[in-house]
Curated annotation (Swiss-Prot):
Pathway: Lipid metabolism; fatty acid metabolism. Belongs to the acyl-CoA dehydrogenase family. Its cofactor is FAD. A 2,3-saturated acyl-CoA binds at residues 171, 224-225, 301, 338, 447, 456, 460-461. It comes from the Bacteria. The gene is fadE5. Keywords: FAD, Fatty acid metabolism, Flavoprotein, Lipid metabolism, Oxidoreductase. This is Broad-specificity linear acyl-CoA dehydrogenase FadE5. Its EC number is 1.3.8.8, 1.3.8.7, 1.3.8.1. Disulfide bonds: none annotated. Acyl-CoA dehydrogenase that exhibits broad specificity for linear acyl-CoA substrates, with a preference for long-chain substrates. FAD binds at residues 162-165, 171, 198, 326, 420-424, 449. It catalyses: a long-chain 2,3-saturated fatty acyl-CoA + oxidized [electron-transfer flavoprotein] + H(+) = a long-chain (2E)-enoyl-CoA + reduced [electron-transfer flavoprotein]; a medium-chain 2,3-saturated fatty acyl-CoA + oxidized [electron-transfer flavoprotein] + H(+) = a medium-chain (2E)-enoyl-CoA + reduced [electron-transfer flavoprotein]; a short-chain 2,3-saturated fatty acyl-CoA + oxidized [electron-transfer flavoprotein] + H(+) = a short-chain (2E)-enoyl-CoA + reduced [electron-transfer flavoprotein]; octadecanoyl-CoA + oxidized [electron-transfer flavoprotein] + H(+) = (2E)-octadecenoyl-CoA + reduced [electron-transfer flavoprotein].
Amino acid sequence: MSHYRSNVRDQVFNLFEVLGVDKALGHGEFSDVDVDTARDMLAEVSRLAEGPVAESFVEGDRNPPVFDPKTHSVMLPESFKKSVNAMLEAGWDKVGIDEALGGMPMPKAVVWALHEHILGANPAVWMYAGGAGFAQILYHLGTEEQKKWAVLAAERGWGSTMVLTEPDAGSDVGAARTKAVQQADGSWHIDGVKRFITSGDSGDLFENIFHLVLARPEGAGPGTKGLSLYFVPKFLFDVETGEPGERNGVFVTNVEHKMGLKVSATCELAFGQHGVPAKGWLVGEVHNGIAQMFEVIEQARMMVGTKAIATLSTGYLNALQYAKSRVQGADLTQMTDKTAPRVTITHHPDVRRSLMTQKAYAEGLRALYLYTATFQDAAVAEVVHGVDAKLAVKVNDLMLPVVKGVGSEQAYAKLTESLQTLGGSGFLQDYPIEQYIRDAKIDSLYEGTTAIQAQDFFFRKIVRDKGVALAHVSGQIQEFVDSGAGNGRLKTERALLAKALTDVQGMAAALTGYLMAAQQDVTSLYKVGLGSVRFLMSVGDLIIGWLLQRQAAVAVAALDAGATGDERSFYEGKVAVASFFAKNFLPLLTSTREVIETLDNDIMELDEAAF
């Protein structure tokens, strides 16, 4: 039986009952897509995920890739390669990709809903199968000649990587020392060592791999502004046919041994270190590497957040299934009666608290990433939110650190609740949750740690934006608070949401005050650093609380209209989880606000030896 538990019903509810993505279908760039098509695709990809994709999930963990230092190659488990090929052969990697690359137009919200299933069933499958998405980025950024290479890469199913990190340049990307030397034929020779490269090699899975590499051209300045982006293939190739030729000078020199996500080969790559030059080509023939790479980074951050959320969802659903069947103890109200019947653990208060917490974050975070995705297509953003393309970009930029940072942190934390639901059984490899936890920890680390996300969120997405995008989202929340949504059944919850909004606005004001005070005392910036992660997490809870209440309002209307059977249970669950979150989590923002408003620099002034 598959470990993966999907929730297509909740996706459909978000997309078409709450967000109104259906309004963007059947016309314009999405004229070939209707609601039935989208529903069918979600059902089909969930079946693929539960079957062929999930089949190698355990084996890939127990028998991870093997590195051969003599050939500088990585050998993947055969079962895992079958899972990757099942996704590629079905064409799911091309959904939402430009038609010029063999793709089909699809709103990003639907695309990410489809991706959720692959990421929840076997996340490394999605990572290895990302070549078409990277080819699209090259197609958008490249020269006319490079656009042809992108088409070849997509048509021939090449693998791909993003190559930023170095041993001494992790979060501090601007410290990168890998250099690029221009050649007479217009190509560049890349020289240096990169580390922590996902899918750096994959044996015979792909005929070729192209690396998008950040390197510093000879004579360029320091920091991120001195970096440029290069296209570096594993094999040089015929530019007309794509047929692979000579081996290029980029080789795997190590594969990391990791806590989780083991089947994803995390590689050290050496460029130009083995007697063969590593030939690369400047992407777009412009020296604008970090800005270009952010096209890749933003896609990666959305993926990481969705991966974390997908993992939490299947973790919760596994825990729920277990709790419904596990009989243990009597009802708490009969605890002194030794003859009382034994009950399933879903009858116990703390198990219910835990399950509802898992449900709140699994479904609230799903709503978060889908809401964010509706700003990733100008046409969808205009129809769904009434915003122009410029504001849509700003709101998407604002939300990405929330999806990635909050999604990764909350999913990892709440997966421990999923494991706890299973008791001692959860600690065993007989159940998938211990692997979920190991696989999910990386999500708060790569593609920018949570602290990096929080600083980006405050300094760039709020301060530099002058609060424009934040004001839009806050305005939507305030509009909901002021509405009569819920037909009289959500008054208490809306009042709690209003207080939470005020608290988050107070946090933003406090952090802004510390930033302004830094003009006279630069150490005031430390207070921003001390409060930024807590602020990001609080914004996440605020938005989750709001989106759950939006769902509850829709559910109340459906219940009032006479929903029956499973549908009635579904909608009742939506009302219950929104109320639970409002009453149990939103009030906690008040204390977080108090902490942020009274921050001091005591720990920054403490001697390091005292830690």
